[in-house]
């Protein structure tokens, strides 16, 4: 039997549709308009595309949004000065520095210069520390893993006792994903490039999250029949002279083994942007002393 194809695009649209109502009510009840500022250094075409998509979605939802474009020659100190300026602006609730930044700039220094209350990517050490110590209600959670967990819960809400395997150990997806699954009482294994017999671990997983950045890396023979498969990868490949995007999982094979699987595109990607918007609204509420407002609209 073919797997349930988890329509991340439709689910993300449901989330943002509800969030738009939340934002409108926030304006009516508190005269608060959440504001997201994206800082983009350099002229990487993919980064510019991502930023345009984020800004378009923010404006559609009724957020204030602005993109600050800086040349690739921008010094680290100049970027830090700009972030301090945004940190000190009470009208700015969310700050995102689009990654990657040019090589002469220390990415971690920049991330940790952002006020953690405004760190809508959820990458600041304060937010990471709170997440990893079980304080997810008191931090901003990285958008992609948060979106992945939401997708998993559309298939089964009770994850307690499930065996989960996360392929990848990045700070952006792999590590926080493992942490979120632990928080749901899963038994979590993280595998990576140095893992021996990686497929053996995958084949025992009730929940398999692939975030490795290698096209069609996960074969159907690695997947436990009936598993939930979340494919975070988005890789550009060329087939018969035509470029297309594929995930880290061999979708054509895997959909005949898994019980539920995300497609690429249209799976995890839209959820990342949706939860960036959620984080921005939550950040605005937190900075304004408005407690649990977003949670009245969305089951987070």
From Swiss-Prot:
Key words of the record: Amino-acid biosynthesis, Histidine biosynthesis, Hydrolase, Methionine biosynthesis, Multifunctional enzyme, NADP, One-carbon metabolism, Oxidoreductase, Purine biosynthesis
Q: Which Gene3D superfamilies match?
A: Leucine Dehydrogenase, chain A, domain 1, NAD(P)-binding Rossmann-like Domain
Residues binding NADP(+): 168-170, 193, 234
EC number from the UniProt entry? 1.5.1.5, 3.5.4.9
How the protein assembles, per its UniProt entry? Homodimer.
* PANTHER family, per database record: C-1-TETRAHYDROFOLATE SYNTHASE, CYTOPLASMIC, C-1-TETRAHYDROFOLATE SYNTHASE, CYTOPLASMIC-RELATED
Q: What is this protein called?
A: Bifunctional protein FolD
Q: Which gene encodes it?
A: folD
């Amino acid at each position: 039997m073919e797997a349930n194809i988890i329509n991340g695009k439709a689910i993300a649209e449901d989330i943002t549709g509800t969030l738009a109502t939340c934002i409108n009510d926030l304006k009516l009840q508190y005269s608060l308009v959440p504001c997201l500022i994206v800082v983009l250094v350099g002229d990487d075409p993919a980064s510019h595309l991502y930023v345009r998509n984020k800004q378009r979605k923010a404006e559609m939802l009724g957020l204030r949004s602005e993109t600050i474009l800086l040349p690739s020659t921008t010094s680290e100190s100049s970027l830090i000065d700009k972030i301090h300026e945004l940190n000190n602006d009470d009208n700015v609730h969310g700050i995102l520095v689009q990654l990657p930044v040019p090589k002469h700039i220390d990415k971690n220094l920049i991330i940790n210069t952002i006020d953690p209350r405004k760190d809508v990517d959820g990458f600041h050490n304060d937010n990471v520390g709170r997440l990893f110590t079980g304080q997810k209600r008191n931090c901003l959670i990285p958008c992609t893993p948060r979106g992945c967990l939401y997708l998993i819960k559309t298939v089964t809400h009770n994850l307690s006792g499930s065996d989960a395997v996360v392929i990848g150990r990045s700070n952006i997806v792999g590590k926080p994903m493992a942490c979120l699954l632990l928080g749901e009482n899963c038994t979590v294994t993280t595998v990576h490039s140095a893992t021996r017999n990686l497929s053996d671990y995958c084949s025992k997983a009730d929940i398999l999250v692939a975030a490795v950045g290698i096209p069609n890396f996960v074969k159907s023979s690695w997947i436990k029949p009936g598993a939930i498969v979340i494919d975070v990868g988005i890789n550009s490949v060329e087939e018969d002279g035509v470029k297309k995007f594929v995930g880290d999982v061999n979708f054509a094979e895997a959909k005949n083994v898994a019980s539920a699987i995300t497609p690429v595109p249209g799976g995890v990607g839209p959820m990342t942007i949706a939860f960036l918007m959620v984080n921005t609204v939550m950040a605005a509420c937190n900075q304004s002393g408005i407690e649990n407002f977003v949670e009245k609209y969305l089951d987070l």
